[in-house]
């Protein structure tokens, strides 16, 4: 393979990885609370997110490398692209993919849990007294992590001893027969990958469509910061009413609350607590109003007003892109449901993919690398951004109970680790969705074509230089010797198709999960565009209480360290 071309492809991937590390670092820095930062937790979060996104972003490199072996204009393999060279390319990509997938699984199932328990085991008092050493802390965290290691070992053993899939009578797999695994080790790895991908897809179909549907509304509708004036008035009114009611109750007892009835005493206690909350809220709002009057905020507000048309354009563009991806996913899932040759028996694999707008766009742009890489990266970042917005909006929940809330500058290390674990699993679901649902034809063969013409001899390739109409795009169902000798599927599609074929239950669950994805996106999109924004007063009160605590801690620190 020409060295300059392969260097360009891998250099583009290196740039993307650098951008991924920056994106992950910014995300963690923005959302993690500054009061309780942990360098190890931050490293694990950044590394995990970057590693998962690097796995997804390897697809355009995969497609570019296998597609470079053929001439899309002639439908022939290039002179240097012998079968030995093609095998070297696919083997190196397979090693990289398996290494990344294994690393992803370890990070999700072992690395992040260990970081969680490592942080939980930290005792500041014991550490300062010398009673807690790093070795003791490491051993305590490892003991709790052993349960997760046991889960990984159990999954590998289940995959190792699970029955091998075979071609069933009445379901001729044809092209897909070669995807059935006979190696026990590869069978175990495929099961582990299918399991974590299915778990990730369960999170993906809830959080990602929620965030994607909310994104356009965040750009199109105005921010509710203007509600501060209204909130100041309503808070002052509530405070006046509260104090007037307290005066009435205190007037009944002459200032001695012991003379009040139990009902009035409970009401007075409630009013006192409510008064403290309202005072904190009033101080917080006044502080924010003072910040809004500073010149940087004033300049920023004026700049936002000037750029308002571009913000609307961005929101409308996000709406169109989201709608295009929704249509592409809908077309593929219906195509799989109707045209799969063996339906749920083989995980709804397709013999030939019908037209898909996103896949078509990527195939056309792949003829001028790295144009397809840029478009693909923007789509992946959009889905990841939507996943983050979904996690922030919904929070970390067990069933309907919210365990942690993800907020800018207010997320604890424990919540940050759980959010990272969720995002890594979601990214595995995103990886399957992009390859198998969003752009299946691009992800499988890219722009590869073959010459559907009988060769003049067994050693020569078919020549379509005078028969351009016989140059056809590669597909799984291309029943032609020329296609078998010319077309090379991407390694990513091969690995994920093996998951669906060897474990059809995973393939069926992943297909039906995308119907849920489409439905949730549609419902939340309509609701977000129709429903007006509301100010969360409960969250405002929590911010006020936290600001008061920080102010007290700061004043205590100043009084304890006189200059």
UniProtKB/Swiss-Prot annotation:
Region (Disordered): 537-563
Keywords associated with the record: Cobalamin, Cobalt, Glycoprotein, Lysosome, Membrane, Transmembrane, Transmembrane helix, Transport
A Pfam family per the record: LMBR1
Membrane-crossing segments per the record: 8-28, 40-60, 95-115, 144-164, 188-208, 314-334, 374-394, 416-436, 506-526
The keyword Transmembrane helix is annotated on this UniProt entry: yes
A cellular component term, taken from the record's GO annotations: vacuolar membrane
Glycan attachment points: 228
Membrane topology designation: Multi-pass membrane protein
Cystine residue pairs: none
Biological processes per GO annotation: protein localization to vacuole
Subcellular location field: Lysosome membrane
Gene Ontology MF annotations: cobalamin binding
Compositional bias of kind Acidic residues: 539-551
Family, similarity comment: Belongs to the LIMR family. LMBRD1 subfamily.
Cited PANTHER family: LYSOSOMAL COBALAMIN TRANSPORT ESCORT PROTEIN LMBD1 (PTHR16130:SF2), LYSOSOMAL COBALAMIN TRANSPORTER-RELATED (PTHR16130)
Function as written in the Swiss-Prot or TrEMBL entry: Probable lysosomal cobalamin transporter. Required to export cobalamin from lysosomes allowing its conversion to cofactors.
Protein name stated in the entry: Probable lysosomal cobalamin transporter
């Amino acid at each position: 393979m020409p060295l300059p071309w392969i260097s360009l492809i891998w250099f583009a991937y290196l740039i993307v990885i650098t951008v991924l590390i920056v994106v992950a670092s910014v995300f963690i820095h923005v959302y993690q609370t500054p009061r309780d930062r942990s360098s190890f937790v931050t490293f694990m979060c950044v590394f995990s997110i970057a590693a998962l996104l690097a796995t997804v972003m390897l697809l355009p490199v995969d497609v570019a490398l296998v597609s470079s072996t053929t001439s899309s204009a002639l439908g022939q393999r290039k002179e240097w692209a012998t079968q030995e060279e093609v095998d070297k390319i696919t083997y190196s990509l397979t090693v990289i993919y398996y290494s990344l997938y294994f690393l992803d699984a370890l990070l999700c199932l072992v690395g992040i849990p260990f970081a969680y328990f490592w942080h939980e085991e930290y005792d500041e008092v014991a550490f300062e007294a010398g009673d807690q050493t790093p070795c003791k802390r490491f051993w305590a965290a490892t003991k709790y992590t052993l349960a997760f290691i046991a889960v990984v070992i159990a999954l590998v053993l289940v995959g190792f001893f699970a029955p091998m899939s075979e071609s069933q009578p009445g379901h001729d797999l044809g092209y897909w027969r070669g995807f059935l695994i006979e190696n026990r080790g590869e069978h175990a790895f495929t099961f582990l990958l299918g399991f974590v991908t299915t778990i990730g897809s369960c999170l993906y179909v809830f959080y990602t469509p929620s965030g994607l549907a909310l994104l356009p509304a965040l750009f199109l509708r105005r921010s509710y910061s203007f509600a501060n004036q209204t909130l100041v008035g309503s808070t002052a009114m509530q405070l006046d009413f509260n104090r007037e009611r307290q005066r009435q109750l205190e007037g009944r007892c002459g200032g001695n609350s012991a003379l009040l009835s139990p009902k009035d005493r409970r009401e007075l206690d409630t009013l006192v607590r409510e008064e403290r909350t309202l005072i904190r809220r009033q101080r917080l709002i006044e502080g924010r109003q003072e910040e809004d009057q500073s010149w940087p905020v004033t300049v920023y507000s004026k700049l936002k007003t000037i750029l308002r048309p571009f913000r609307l354009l961005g929101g409308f563009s996000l709406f169109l892109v989201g709608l295009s991806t929704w249509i592409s996913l809908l077309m593929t899932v219906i195509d799989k449901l109707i045209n799969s040759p063996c339906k749920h028996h083989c995980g709804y694999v397709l013999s030939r993919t019908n037209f898909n707008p996103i896949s078509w766009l990527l195939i056309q742009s792949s003829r001028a690398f790295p144009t397809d890489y840029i478009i693909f990266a923007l789509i992946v970042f959009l889905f990841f951004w939507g996943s983050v917005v979904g996690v922030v909006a919904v929070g970390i929940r067990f069933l309907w109970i919210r365990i942690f809330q993800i907020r800018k500058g207010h997320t604890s290390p424990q919540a940050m680790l759980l959010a990272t674990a969720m995002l890594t699993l979601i990214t595995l679901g995103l990886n399957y969705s992009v390859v198998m649902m969003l752009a299946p034809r691009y992800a499988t063969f890219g722009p590869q074509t073959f010459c559907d013409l009988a060769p003049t001899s067994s050693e020569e390739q078919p020549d379509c230089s005078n028969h351009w109409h016989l140059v056809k795009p590669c597909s799984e169902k291309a029943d032609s010797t020329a296609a078998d000798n010319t077309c090379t599927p991407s390694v990513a599609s091969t690995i994920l198709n093996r998951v669906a074929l060897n474990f059809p239950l995973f393939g069926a669950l992943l297909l039906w999960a995308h119907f849920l994805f489409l439905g949730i996106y549609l419902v939340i999109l309509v609701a977000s565009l129709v429903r007006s924004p509301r100010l969360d007063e409960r969250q405002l009160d929590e911010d006020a209480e936290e600001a008061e605590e920080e102010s007290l801690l700061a004043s205590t620190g100043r009084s304890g360290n006189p200059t």
